[in-house]
């Protein structure tokens, strides 16, 4: 897919896109990503930006703690003189977890650091016809370790993005996977219908019902609002 954050491997661009893509669809992120970079084209500009500017640029994406942590990460990067180029250093940045650190490390610095999300877990569990619950922490660790050992030297970024693309477009979460188009179909142990039951998911918990009272303060045609910080 032609995605704006794949046109270069600038660490700031990759970090921004990965943070935006958390909890947000790809199509929705495109315009926000371009607008954000137009306003704050460098990590230094992000580090120095006013909070109101950040919140306005993020308006509509939700989960505002993401952009606040993104700025804290930018400030840490500027303070140390540049992006860390190792997995531990990337993980130490505010708001950066294993997936984001893996994406930045492999795409930008050619590190064998897997970026394992739901898409990658689905691809890998189907390849092996694995019937362990996809939510099991041990499964994620096992898959992360197996992928790290398989990363091709000099092509770590390509490998990460290929896995992302495979899970997003070929071996997707909804409906039948496009097995004829899959480049690893010959290795897949779930292609003959077993994919329907893989990945294995735990039983859904019953929804909790809450009853709350909401007070609205009105004076004529105006309503009192309290800004959430």
State what each model feature region is.
Residues 1-180, 184-194:
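Catalytic cores of DNA base-excision repair glycosylases
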Residues 196-229:
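N-terminal strand-loop-strand
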């Amino acid at each position: 897919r032609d995605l704006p954050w794949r046109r270069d491997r600038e660490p700031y661009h990759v970090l921004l896109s990965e943070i935006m893509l958390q909890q947000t669809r790809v199509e929705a992120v495109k315009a926000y990503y371009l607008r954000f970079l137009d306003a704050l084209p460098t990590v230094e500009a992000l580090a120095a930006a006013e909070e109101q500017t950040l919140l306005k640029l993020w308006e509509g994406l939700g989960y505002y703690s993401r952009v606040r942590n993104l700025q804290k990460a930018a400030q840490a990067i500027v303070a140390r003189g540049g992006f860390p180029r190792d997995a531990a250093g990337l993980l130490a940045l505010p708001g950066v977890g294993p997936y984001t650190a893996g994406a930045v490390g492999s795409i930008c610095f050619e590190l064998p650091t897997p970026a394992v999300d739901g898409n990658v877990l689905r691809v890998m569990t189907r390849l092996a016809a694995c019937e362990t619950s996809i939510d099991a922490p041990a499964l994620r660790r096992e898959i992360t370790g197996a992928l790290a050992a398989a990363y091709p030297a000099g092509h770590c970024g390509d490998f990460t993005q290929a896995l992302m693309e495979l899970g997003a477009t070929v071996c997707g979460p909804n409906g039948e996977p496009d097995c004829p188009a899959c480049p690893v179909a010959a290795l897949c142990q779930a292609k003959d219908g077993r994919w329907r039951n893989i990945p294995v998911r735990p039983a859904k918990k019953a929804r909790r019902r809450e009853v709350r009272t909401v007070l609205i303060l009105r004076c004529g045609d105006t309503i009192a609002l309290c800004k959430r910080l």
